[in-house]
Amino acid sequence: VYEQMTPGRFVGALYEICFAGVQVFREATNQAVHEAGAPWPGSRAIGVPLRMDGNARFRGAPVDADALVTLGAGDELDFYTPRGFEILGLVVDEHALETHARQVEHRDLDEALAGKGVFKPGATRLSEFRRLLASVMQSLEVNPAALQHRQTQRVLEQSMLGAAMAVV
């Protein structure tokens, strides 16, 4: 649910690509909004701001351009965004992320997240994550037929899981 918090004409856009339990999206709004809801059942959502013309709050915690936000299965979305806000997001199957974290990264997802919804992974890791999500969206917009191949979907899914663990 989106509720516009500032007066004026609303202009927004949502672009998404979905495959094999993965969603990559880009969302833009020109007005301050309050977003409420929940991610897909059994999923983990991660968002990274691209543009912010003010401050945001995610589940009560302050968010700036150097932060990323995350929401897991069973978590409630409570996100106040400023005017002129744009975000890139990744939603993955939480069980697949837990398995990837344990078997590939040798990390415990719950320990890595530590119940936090806002992270400051550092400029380099944040920039790499932004570039990867933008690149995946751009590549698949140009060549959507690539997703017809299950192997391509698996490679992209593994890349997305690795990228998610790199920023938390």
Q: What is each stretch, according to the model?
A:
Residues 1-49:
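N-terminal low-complexity or simple alpha-helical regulatory segments
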Residues 1-9, 55-168:
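Alpha-helical bundle regulatory/interaction domains
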Residues 25, 51, 76-78:
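Short, electropositive, low-hydrophobicity segments enriched in small/polar residues
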Residues 31, 50-52, 94-96:
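Non-catalytic surface loops within mature trypsin-like serine protease
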